[in-house]
A protein has these predicted regions:
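Conserved alpha/beta enzyme-core scaffold
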Residues: 1-498
Length: 498
């Protein structure tokens, strides 16, 4: 069947008001970049005529501004899931301009197949190649591409020539059977291949192919500073101690790491520490630091869902495919983030906390308990099942006016039962095997900024008798003071003891 080449505007004509639309990619990597803008223009035109036009959006995770940003600014979104990081979309969601369902990334594809989230009308996917018999080669990110292509009534492909056809072979596309027929996912090392090198679809569903020549949108991280470097060193030193104590095997285990400055610092410090052997990565996002360590021989293999790297690095990878092709594997997020595989491989999972309380609970998503930041992403997928789950965070934010550690988290994403270790620039709190009071003292002693230690020690002393000594009269005093004066330093416990 011959492929039909169309414009982005023609592609947008296949997307209707109230459609549920699935998009490929994971972070800006692998996301469609021109059709979403055409849909946004269509929405604006319909709104100017007095007609409704909004769609339900299903993505792999966050996307680029050309997708989430364009559609948010056009008020073209009625529903969005999962993780997001675009400022305009965030504002829309927090103002209730669109409904947002935050969910674990590993669960999205199967939830779609189960019918929990409705049908998929249209799949819009980016490809490095597509054949007339329906073989789609993804680009630098996979996300939920296989599932949305199989479920959608109509498929629109952005054929992006920035990604060479020779990338074929860097993907491992596998969808597990649904219950009651599901079997184990047969991944026993990060480099195991279990699926296909492309996504196979009914070519009759491909309503059009839009040719593009678009780079990935990449946000720049701010330079590493003393705080992030100290966190990185503390993580590396802690892992070396675990190896020497025999709690981690001397061969080490695969690593999962989040994205951002702290993650880059952690990876860099691990790479520099020769007491940590060369290691494998089994993660969701493969970023610049992983590629740098791979070139140095410190990372042996990286399995992920996306190459969320700078355009300079992606050009380097494509120019040296002979070197990288047998060292990188991109999978659907249902596999890259699967808790079954995480537990089998025995990952060290390192993720970032937005806020923690002194008893070891983690808030990854909500500022002051109400305002959505980004979402839980894949942190829950990995944390619960990891051999060793670590959360990192700077001890303070906003020039010290906000403590990352509070009496009680204002929103709970990861409970004390899943969080094994917390690390800041001041040190390491190893919470394994500790009671709530022991955890609190360990966190205050090792992780809390010195300015906030007295306040949190006083709070612990005010705790109501019981296994976990919270004081419900004043457990949110830090948040109340932040709202009142803009500075958590100003907490006055005497206000609560009248």
């Amino acid at each position: 069947m011959a492929l039909k080449f169309i414009t982005a505007e023609e592609a947008a004509s296949f997307v209707h008001h109230d459609d549920n639309v699935g998009f490929s990619g994971f972070t800006p990597a692998g996301c469609p970049k021109v059709v979403p803008g055409a849909i946004a223009k269509k929405a604006i035109a319909e709104h100017e005529k007095g007609n409704p036009f909004q769609i339900g959006m299903f993505t792999g995770a966050s996307t680029g501004d050309k997708l989430d940003g364009e559609l948010a600014r056009a008020n073209a979104i009625k529903f969005r899931t999962p993780y997001q990081s675009n400022k305009d979309l965030r504002a829309l969601l927090n103002s209730h301009g669109a409904q947002y369902f935050d969910m674990h990334l590993s669960e999205l594809a199967q939830s779609l197949r189960y019918g929990f989230l409705g049908k998929i009308d249209v799949a819009i996917v980016e490809a490095a190649d597509v054949t007339e018999d329906g073989e789609i080669v993804p680009t630098s990110g996979v996300g939920i591409l296989p599932t949305i292509c199989r479920m959608a009534d109509r498929i629109i492909i952005e054929l992006n020539c920035r990604h060479p056809k020779e990338i074929r072979g860097m993907h491992d596309i596998y969808e597990p059977a649904d219950p009651p027929y599901r079997r184990e996912i047969p991944i026993y090392t990060p480099s195991d291949r279990i699926g296909s090198d492309c996504v196979k679809v009914d070519p009759a569903k491909i309503v059009g192919v839009v040719k593009t020549d678009e780079p990935n949108e990449g946000g720049k991280f701010s330079p590493l500073d003393d705080v992030t470097m100290a966190i990185g060193q503390n993580v590396a030193n802690f892992l070396v101690g675990e190896i020497k104590a025999g709690r981690l095997p001397k061969e080490f285990v695969p690593l999962q790491s989040g994205v951002g400055n702290v993650a880059n610092a952690v990876l860099g410090c691990m790479g520099e520490n020769k007491d940590i052997p060369a290691f494998n990565v089994y993660t969701e996002v493969i970023q610049d630091a992983v590629i740098a360590l791979m070139k140095e021989g410190r990372v042996k293999f990286a399995s992920g869902c996306s190459l969320s790297v700078s355009n300079e690095v992606i050009r380097d990878i494509y120019a040296n495919l002979d070197f990288f092709k047998d060292k990188i594997l991109l999978r659907p997020q249902e596999i890259s983030n699967n808790p079954e595989v995480t537990r089998r491989l025995g990952l060290v999972a390192i993720n970032t906390a937005l806020e923690a309380d002194i008893f070891g609970n983690i808030n990854s998503t909500h500022v002051s308990g109400t305002r959505m930041m980004n979402g839980i992403g894949g942190s829950g997928d990995f944390t619960r099942s990891a051999m060793l789950s670590i959360f990192t965070t700077p001890s303070t934010a906003k020039e010290g006016k906000i403590s990352a550690f509070v009496p009680m988290v204002s929103h709970l994403d990861h409970s004390e039962h899943s969080v094994k270790v917390i690390i800041t620039e001041y040190g390491v709190a190893d919470l394994r095997g500790k009671s709530p009071i022991q955890r609190a003292r360990c966190i205050i002693d090792n992780c809390v900024h010195p300015d906030y230690k007295p306040l949190l020690e006083e709070y612990l002393a005010m705790g109501i008798k019981g296994h976990t000594p919270q004081n419900l009269k004043c457990c949110f005093a830090f948040h109340e003071e932040l709202a009142a004066s803009g500075d958590m330093h100003n907490v006055d416990w005497s206000k609560y003891n009248k």
